[in-house]
């Protein structure tokens, strides 16, 4: 794959990212992903190096991932490889019930910066809306973070259409653009489309970053009614659900074969790219990372996107 990838602006900011990023929730999380058991830092550093070698420049983490471990790991890898200037690095603030003042947001950002070993992050996001505190209050703190030079740009995550509009307006009053809204978005989670969020973000020139773009592994085709995922995912995706999505998996395989034997994961990621989103799949090892890279360098036809839309809607209509 060419190391020269087209770059996409994050809203009206000066940040430019590749069409595919890397989400590193798995880097440090033991509960959902089993960090430290089936994989560890020795597996993750090759993922980091291969990601940059593939020309991908966008990595997304959060203070909540592994209780800060994810931030420390990526900071360590950046320092060891002297690759900070090759990255657009994003992290997130968690508005937990005991830290609801704007000052706590700035304190949390400084703690994140200490963990990644930087004086400034590229994109700082609020991980979810916390309704007891007005969105406008949070956005004032985010604008303060930009003015203090602690972050180049700011975004939100898991915000509804109306919340996105309010965040955008509040930041605009401070002269700060809203870069992005990071939401769960995949062939098995179409709420960004059905809720009107995609249209709102398009109208406001706010980028959509798609987390869980292969539905926590469900769109890989690896899991079937006879092979249920381990851990917490077993509760989310039972045999009945896996049976229901098999026609969609079959279509992903069929379309992938028409594009040089692309995998269901690669087709799923390309579908999101065609939708104008920036997917950020995770990777616990080099094999998974290389499979993600295979979503780049080609494009689904409009007809294939429509077929996937239709099959995906069938799955959701039976939920």
Where is each model-derived feature located?
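Active-site mouth loops of central-metabolism enzymes
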Residues: 28-42, 93-103, 130-132
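Structural motif
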Residues: 50, 54, 115-116, 149, ...
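Active-site groove signature of glycoside hydrolases
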Residues: 116-132
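A short, structured active-site edge motif that brings together acidic residues
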Residues: 85-97, 124, 182-185
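N-terminal binding-site loop/beta-alpha segment at the start of enzyme catalytic domains
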Residues: 1-87, 147
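Beta/alpha (TIM)-barrel catalytic core signal, keyed to glycine-rich beta->alpha loops juxtaposed to Asp/Glu
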Residues: 4-7, 129-317
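Short, acidic/polar
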Residues: 37-51, 101-116, 164-165
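Residues at the N-termini of beta-strands
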Residues: 19, 58, 120-123, 152-153, ...
